[in-house]
A protein has these predicted regions:
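Residues that define the transmembrane beta-barrel architecture of outer-membrane proteins
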Residues: 11-15, 22, 74-78, 122-126, ...
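Residues on the lipid-exposed face of transmembrane beta-strands in outer-membrane beta-barrel proteins
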Residues: 16-21, 80-84, 93, 128-132, ...
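Extracellular loop and loop/strand-boundary signature of outer-membrane beta-barrel proteins
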Residues: 2-5, 64-68, 112-116, 153-162
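Outer membrane beta-barrel
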Residues: 1-49, 87
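Outer-membrane beta-barrel translocator domains and adjoining extracellular loop/strand segments
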Residues: 41-47, 104-111, 151-158
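Detector for outer-membrane/organellar transmembrane beta-barrel domains
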Residues: 96-98, 136-174
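Transmembrane beta-strands of outer-membrane beta-barrel pores
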Residues: 23-25, 32-38, 86, 95-101, ...
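Membrane-embedded beta-barrel scaffold of Gram-negative outer-membrane proteins
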Residues: 80-108
Length: 174
């Protein structure tokens, strides 16, 4: 398998509604995604990218039943972005109430097999970016704050209650 994405994967359609309001200095984009679609995870034991643990004594059973959020109005994803293009500086602010597309993997052993199930959790996102010309260079900065983002634990911790974490990512460059 190749590490680079195929062009078809990059241009994949998304079931979403987008609304724009803009003028020469400001743009507002609102987004609503009524359906959930998580990542397609490789679960075949022969696949080197498989998310299932290797060399286990128990037979592994992948079970996705009931793991995805149900198709309810309360489960939709929504967000917005407000961009400004002003003399000497561009900046934007964004927020998103979404589902983490990468599931937490839970492990439940019973008898001679272990059931492996994906679990999806809600998360929030707040972010912003800024661009400022400095002579022939442009100073650019971005920041993202993820609220209640869940990460996969070691398989031994799969039976424990999972909790979300708040994370901050940022980048500044010229």
């Amino acid at each position: 398998e190749f590490l680079a994405q195929d062009y078809d994967d990059i241009r994949m359609p998304v079931n979403a509604l987008r609304f724009f309001v803009f003028n020469e200095k400001m743009k507002l984009e609102l987004l609503a995604v009524p359906t959930f679609e998580g990542y397609k995870l490789p679960t075949d034991a022969e696949n080197p990218w498989s998310v299932l643990p290797k060399n286990t004594a128990l037979h592994l059973v992948w079970n996705e039943d009931g793991s995805s959020p149900k198709l309810h109005f309360s489960n939709k994803e929504y967000g917005g972005r407000l961009c400004f293009t002003l003399p000497g500086v561009d900046f934007s602010l964004a927020a998103l109430h979404t589902w983490n597309k990468m599931p937490m993997i839970s492990y439940r052993s019973s008898g001679n097999h272990m059931t492996v199930s994906p679990q999806y959790y809600r998360m929030g996102f707040f972010g912003g970016d800024i661009s400022k010309p400095l002579g022939q260079f442009v100073l650019r900065g971005e920041a993202a704050f993820n609220v209640d983002k869940h990460f996969s634990y070691k398989p031994e911790a799969g039976a424990m209650e999972q909790k979300g974490f708040n994370t901050v990512n940022y980048l500044v460059g010229v």
